[in-house]
Amino acid sequence: MNRIIVVTSGKGGVGKTTTTANLGAALARLGKKVVLIDADFGLRNLDLLLGLEQRIVYTAIDVLADECTIDKALVKDKRLPNLVLLPAAQNRSKDAINAEQMQSLVEQLKDKFDYIIIDCPAGIEAGFRNAVAPAQEAIIVTTPEMSAVRDADRVIGLLEAEDIGKISLIVNRLRPEMVQLNQMISVEDILDLLAVPLIGILPDDQKIIISTNKGEPLVMEEKLSVPGLAFQNIARRLEGQDIPFLDFMAAHNTLLNRIRRRLLGG
């Protein structure tokens, strides 16, 4: 049975599209057939993060206009045979497609893939409603900032109103040193505020920026970095595996203790 998941946030710039790209690649590496749908019409970026921007010929709009079949619009990733992208049109606004059309696209794909992952545009307007319409599950991406958490709370309420059966949370850009200084909200406090299950924690790491600029998802590295491992673990949890969370706070404390010992000559 396939799964249709929308990745959303409410607030822009929290790492939603980066999450979509890495989860798709990680699931493909686990042997799952995955299609990523870029639902951010007019502002598509998913193709860039996957390094597929030069291979786009048709988009979802062309499929809906009967200018091509959906198979022709799918962009294959030569590095990962199980991963394909259905790109958004870059020259259209977010209202270029409606909820029924989004459901039609998903209907054409659902018998061919194990996972259909929809990259939702930021905000809670028409683009959000369209992306959410065919989804069975949702992953909320937030950062440890009050504005992002408040927006995530609003989105959770909207998802529940749409009868989305399963909602999970990813906390991105965690900085343990700021949490310890009470300059950043802790993961525990975010969970208390949002009251949805946690599926992943990602550190604030420059490797994520480097990978997005290169168009190479972190999970495709031969030797996984810490954020790459965190993304891989999220994919494995989606598959039902019981994977412990990386303890970034403990790792930070261990580093501090090492520095103190060196300074004190211990």
Swiss-Prot record:
It holds the Pfam family AAA_31. InterPro entries: AAA_dom, MinD, MinD_FleN, P-loop_NTPase, ParA/MinD_ATPase. CDD domains: MinD (cd02036). It is a peripheral membrane protein. Keywords: ATP-binding, Cell cycle, Cell division, Cell membrane, Membrane, Nucleotide-binding, Septation. It is found in: Cell membrane. The keyword Cell membrane applies. Its main location: membrane. GO terms for biological process: cytokinesis, division site positioning; division septum assembly. One of its GO terms (molecular function) is ATP binding. ATP binds at K11, G12, G13, V14, G15, K16, T17, T18. One of its GO terms (cellular component) is cytosol. Interacts with MinC and FtsZ. ATPase required for the correct placement of the division site. Cell division inhibitors MinC and MinD act in concert to form an inhibitor capable of blocking formation of the polar Z ring septums. Rapidly oscillates between the poles of the cell to destabilize FtsZ filaments that have formed before they mature into polar Z rings. Belongs to the ParA family. MinD subfamily. This is Septum site-determining protein MinD. It comes from Synechocystis sp. (strain ATCC 27184 / PCC 6803 / Kazusa). The lineage of its organism: Bacteria, Bacillati, Cyanobacteriota, Cyanophyceae, Synechococcales.
